A protein has these predicted regions:
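Accessory DNA-binding and partner-docking regions appended to nucleic-acid-acting proteins
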Residues: 2-5, 340, 353-355, 364-366, ...
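Helicase motor core with emphasis on the C-terminal RecA-like subdomain
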Residues: 3-12, 16, 20, 24-46, ...
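Short alpha-helical segment immediately N-terminal to, or the first helix within
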Residues: 28, 303, 375, 573-574
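Conserved Rossmann-like nucleotide-cofactor binding loop
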Residues: 68
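Catalytic cores of large soluble enzymes that bind and process phosphate-bearing ligands
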Residues: 91, 173-177, 212, 360-364, ...
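Short, charged low-complexity linear segments at domain edges
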Residues: 360-390
Length: 629
């Protein structure tokens, strides 16, 4: 590995080694090679371009659509002793001119810009006059029409790079890209002989679960009662749901805030800051919240409603556990969610695309919704479902998700599955799920008589079953490939590959489980989730809390989020290593030279004070009674 890169990592960021995938990306950039890196949230994508940016001559331009992310990244870089700036609509024209003037004079190594800035005359003139060694495209999936967040302004990046006096290295980063989106990024950005680094989509510290539950409000209250001190995000699909849940929790005394586009800018900013600065542990929000939020200590993300795509879910759920600590991602599912999401898709604005593209995009969106519904209904491993969607190979159940830990009842539904096939064959693939299920149940509906399905052989064939059972069976048969739903606005049910069902040895086994609603009378049990703090003794945890208190004090003084001072993980390492001088403090993971100069003495004094007050305290589980490792 490049020695200078390792030294830069240690000096500025306080880490001894690169994480998985980072080293390969950094080396490729330093070899003047274009790069596309697909790395999960929390994998340290920013270090992949920040380290080479500090080593290479000239300036690195980082293109990001997220104002809040730019501001947080620049704050974090400045804290690490790195001169960086951002240029976006939050600055006045005079502030922008000053930033460009200082950059032209060599003050800044890294400049974050919004993609719209690439069409600005003043910025283009600046870009032609300075040495730009690298253009970094963050959230690179935004350049793909098949990505979940396509932004037309990203297409301008190609012309911007082309018109520079000398072609810089182009590096692109994203956390969410299917094979189709990956190829689109490579092609659209015109990457030359790129190194493609895919570290995988598996966030091993995240525990995924789906709860098919009626009383969602009770579940949320019960969950918060069991995690009272933890930071969490609760996503809702509509503003109305956000407001209703906020009012309910607020009235019950929960320290909670909210975020959606219906609130004015000032209120949104205040509520977001209250959450980021740890003043309010829980935020309820629409998906307008979170893009670019780098808060590392979010311990849980609850989806009150089903998101519209796996890409959205992976990205939103991925805001939990960015610090590597074990965290939970809970999706509360009901059939009503599908109806709401379908309504939101039907009302989507297509005024800026032609008719052919509208048809293709609608098909894509409906297919994504069906895949998301499949995730909510699968009885298989949830982690594998996510990984396989993104094209990753899996090797057996993960044993770290809700489905892997559930007790299922297995029922042979082969006879019923064959009747479903017969019914769909009789409809000749013309009708949707509701008609097929109604026919099989023998429902007395005027619509069925009107369509003539009451004359089918399959009419009433499964009248000894419930609608819920048949929905679950059809969902499982769809997952197995025996059936599929079309991707039109009004999707219909059609036959897939049914040849295995002709074999008498083939059985369709349906797995079911009993959903348990929260018991209001039962006292909440504390979470048993494993954390890094489990490595600390009671005394060690007391020191950790003292260091957190000091961190919050410093964060208020510096007007920045606490995690930018030091992450929880760094504070835990301080408790375990218990440094007594600056040299030992530099051995703590996440303590670089600049942060040592700024904050080292205050943290050393806090540790020394604690040790003087409790001289015989054993701080970590790895120590024996004499305090030896």
């Amino acid at each position: 590995m490049n020695r200078q890169a390792v030294q830069t990592l240690k000096t500025y960021f306080g880490y001894d080694t690169f994480r998985e995938g980072q080293e390969s990306v950094v080396e490729s950039i330093l070899e003047h090679r274009d790069v596309l890196a697909i790395m999960p949230t929390g994998a340290g994508k920013s270090i992949c371009y920040q380290v080479p940016a500090l080593i290479m001559p000239g300036i690195t331009i980082v293109i990001s659509p997220l104002i809040s992310l730019m501001q947080d990244q620049v704050k974090a870089l400045n804290e690490a002793g790195i001169h960086a700036a951002f240029i976006n609509s939050s600055l006045s024209e005079s502030q922008i001119s000053k930033a460009l003037y200082l950059a032209a004079g060599g003050r800044y190594k890294i400049i974050y810009v919004a993609p719209e800035r690439l069409e600005n005359y003043e910025f283009l003139e600046f870009a032609r006059q300075v040495e730009i060694s690298m253009v970094t495209v963050d959230e690179a999936h935004c350049i793909s029409q098949w990505g979940q967040d396509f932004r037309p302004s990203y297409v301008k990046i190609v012309d911007f790079v082309k018109n520079l006096p000398g072609r810089p290295i182009v590096s692109a980063f994203t956390a969410t890209a299917t094979e189709e989106v990956k190829n689109d990024i490579l092609c659209t950005l015109n990457l030359e002989d790129p190194k493609v680094v895919i570290t995988g989509f598996d966030r091993k510290n995240l525990y995924y679960s789906v709860e098919n539950i009626r009383r969602k409000d009770d579940f949320v209250m019960d969950y918060i009662d069991r995690h009272p001190t933890e930071s969490g995000i609760i996503y809702c699909s509509t503003r109305k749901n956000v407001d209703n849940l906020f009012e309910l929790l607020f009235q019950k005394g929960v320290a909670v805030t909210r975020y959606h586009a219906g609130l004015n800018n000032e209120t949104r900013k205040k509520n977001q800051d209250d959450f980021i600065y740890d003043r309010t542990p829980v935020i309820i929000a629409t998906n307008a919240f979170g893009m670019g939020i780098d808060k590392s200590n979010v311990r849980y993300v609850i989806h009150y409603n089903m998101p519209q795509s796996m890409e959205n879910y992976y990205q939103e759920a991925g805001r939990a556990g960015r610090d590597g600590e074990n965290s939970q991602c809970v999706l509360l599912f009901s059939a009503q969610d599908v109806i709401i999401d379908r309504m939101l898709l039907d009302n989507k604005d297509f005024s800026d695309v032609d008719e052919e593209d509208e048809f293709l995009i609608r098909q894509r969106d409906i297919r994504r919704l069906q895949i998301m519904e499949g995730y909510c209904k699968t009885t298989g491993c949830l982690r594998n479902y996510i990984l396989e969607y993104f094209g990753e190979k899996t090797f057996g159940p993960c044993d770290n998700c809700g489905n892997c830990h559930r007790e299922y009842h297995e029922t042979d539904m082969t006879r019923e599955a064959k009747w479903v096939v017969n019914c769909v064959a009789e409809t000749r693939g013309r009708y949707g799920l509701t008609i097929v299920i109604g026919t099989l149940l023998g429902a007395k509906r005027a619509r069925l008589r009107e369509l003539g399905t009451d004359k089918y052989k399959s009419y009433g064939a499964l009248n000894d079953h419930s609608e819920a059972e048949l929905r679950a069976l059809i969902s499982q048969m769809t997952e197995m490939g025996y059936l599929y739903q079309t991707q039109e606005r009004y999707s219909v049910l059609k036959l897939g590959d049914i040849s295995p069902l002709r074999d008498e040895n083939t059985h369709v086994i349906m797995r079911t489980y009993e959903e348990k609603e929260p018991d209001k009378k039962k006292k909440p049990q504390k979470s048993v989730r494993k954390r890094s703090t489990d490595a600390l003794t009671a005394a060690g945890y007391d020191l950790f809390e003292a260091l957190r208190k000091l961190r919050l004090e410093i964060a208020k003084e510096e007007a920045m989020p606490p995690y930018i001072v030091f992450s929880d993980k760094t504070l835990i390492d301080m408790c375990i290593k218990c440094p007594s001088n600056e040299e030992e403090m530099l051995e703590v993971s996440g303590v670089g030279e600049n942060k040592l100069k700024k904050y080292g003495q205050r943290f050393l004094e806090e540790i020394q004070k604690f040790c003087l007050e409790r001289p015989n305290a054993v701080l970590s589980m790895s120590e024996d009674e004499n305090g030896n490792p």
